[in-house]
A protein has these predicted regions:
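N-terminal FAD cofactor-binding segment of flavoenzymes
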Residues: 14, 34-83
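Glycine-rich FAD pyrophosphate-binding loop
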Residues: 16-45, 346
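C-terminal helical "tail/cap" subdomain of flavin- and related membrane-associated enzymes
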Residues: 332-447
């Protein structure tokens, strides 16, 4: 297993059931890590497992949800305890029965890693560089990986029946495959020019009430956004988002002024009297990238790719860790079908599985007129329709739940085009939904 972050850990837990030995190789000191690691620069920022991600994580690692709950990891109902706002209008609060896991990336990763560490057939190779894949050209097979201690020393070959690349967006597998004669890996990308700036605070007010996060989401009309999440007790983390090259300020005064410019007052009201904890951290995400391994004419046996090494998503949609769990489940299903592992079959199955999340992320980014990309008539229609749906969902808990189940990757995107949903959108847009009447011009308030 190349890489021991979330994607590598979920996949390692799966592989440990079917293989006699699983070795996780990572450039960082990962065992016992309680703070964001150098190899995971996005780890400073607010993270979460979407509703479907929580369900899949529990399926992959039984008991994980209760373990995190016992440790105080923030969790809440997708529609009842997460405060979502679009264009200054809060989605109607609605209990969905679906759990979202939030908070600190290092803490979430640590809980999954502790379960992998306790498996009797797993081993961590820390502070180790991955030099190259080992390839048997005669048989068209990856047979292992060459590694080297980060501090220097001799290279070593780790032989393996299966090598899984979970090294993230900087994966070198496309370069290695091309050098081995398998051709160039094509990719799809959408440039969004996103920047996160994150700070942590100690709150002096009850900003959350019974909620666990406050999420005014960026839109073309209001391109500044934020994710304010409880970290337990009186601590919170807040990630401000800027797109198309805008960078939220890192200085405290500028940071607070940015929150005041958001279309809802909740985040600013929570932070204006809060105590800052440490300095701000910024992270740039230029583009979503989907690597199309399934389109290669030839693939070596003994190789799989998971996580951001396979597909990176605009992080404002919160899909990354959920997709890591999904791909681990695809890997499990491919290994457990009773036949020899087929990379082609795996990559095709993984591509099909991530398609809904990719369509949501790319479609959302293409709603911004400045983002370059092909806008089919369907994409234009869907983005206009979703704008009206979110507007109507301010007054309609059923619409809010339908929308959240889709962005939570529980239901397929087509569910929002069902006749019953479309009728409620029309009523909410042109005639009022009849639910929470009179709230159409209100804005979200803290508490």
């Amino acid at each position: 297993m190349l890489g021991a972050s979330i994607a590598g850990l979920f996949s390692a837990h799966v592989l440990a059931r079917s293989h006699s030995r699983v070795v996780l190789v990572d450039r960082d000191e990962v065992v016992g890590a309680k703070r964001p690691r150098r190899g995971v620069p996005q780890g400073h920022h607010v993270h979460g497992l979407l509703a479907s991600g929580q369900l899949m994580a529990e399926d992959l690692v039984p008991g994980l949800t209760q373990q995190m709950l016992d440790a105080g990891v923030p969790m809440g109902d997708l529609g009842g305890q997460l405060r979502w706002s679009f264009n200054g209008r809060r989605l109607a609060s609605t209990r969905t029965g679906l759990v979202v896991v939030g908070g600190d990336r290092a803490v979430l990763e640590g809980h999954v890693r502790s379960r992998v560490e306790h498996l009797p057939n797993t081993e961590f190779r820390q502070a180790t560089d991955i030099v190259a894949l080992v390839h048997d050209e005669a048989h068209g097979r990856v047979t292992g990986v060459r590694v080297q201690p980060r501090g220097g020393g001799s290279e070593e070959v780790l032989s393996a029946d299966l090598v899984v690349d979970a090294t993230g967006r900087g994966s070198r597998t496309p370069v290695w495959l091309e050098s081995m004669g398998y051709g160039r890996v094509s990719s799809d990308s959408v440039k969004i020019g996103l920047t996160y700036t994150t700070r942590r605070f100690r709150l002096r007010n009850d900003a959350f009430g019974n909620d666990v996060s406050v999420n005014p989401v960026a839109t073309p009309r209001h391109p500044r956004g934020a994710f304010l999440t409880t970290l337990g007790g009186d601590r919170c983390g807040v990630s401000l988002t800027g797109v198309l090259g805008e960078t939220p300020p890192s200085d405290l005064a500028g940071f607070l002024e940015y929150t005041r410019s958001l279309p809802v007052p909740d985040v600013y009201e929570a932070l204006r009297d809060a105590e800052p904890l440490g300095d701000a951290i910024s992270f740039r995400f230029p583009a979503s990238v989907r690597r199309r391994y399934e389109r290669l004419r030839r693939l070596p046996t003994g190789l799989a790719v998971v996580g951001d090494a396979l597909c990176t998503f605009n992080p404002v949609y919160g899909q990354g860790m959920t997709m890591a769990a999904l791909q681990a489940r695809v890997l499990r299903d491919q290994i457990g079908d009773g036949t020899e592992f087929s990379p082609r079959s795996y990559f095709r199955a993984a591509s099909r599985a991530l398609e809904p999340a990719w369509s949501i992320a790319v479609g959302g980014d293409l709603a911004f007129p400045e983002v370059q990309g092909r806008r089919t008539p369907l994409i234009r229609f869907v983005n206009a329709y979703l704008d009206r749906l979110r507007h109507a969902a301010h007054d309609d808990p059923r619409l809010a739940e339908a929308f959240l189940r889709v962005i939570g990757l529980v239901d397929a995107p087509e569910r929002l085009l069902a006749p019953g949903v479309a009728l409620r959108v029309l009523r909410g847009t042109y005639g009022g939904s009849g639910e929470r009447a009179g709230a159409r011009t209100g804005v979200s308030r803290a508490g």
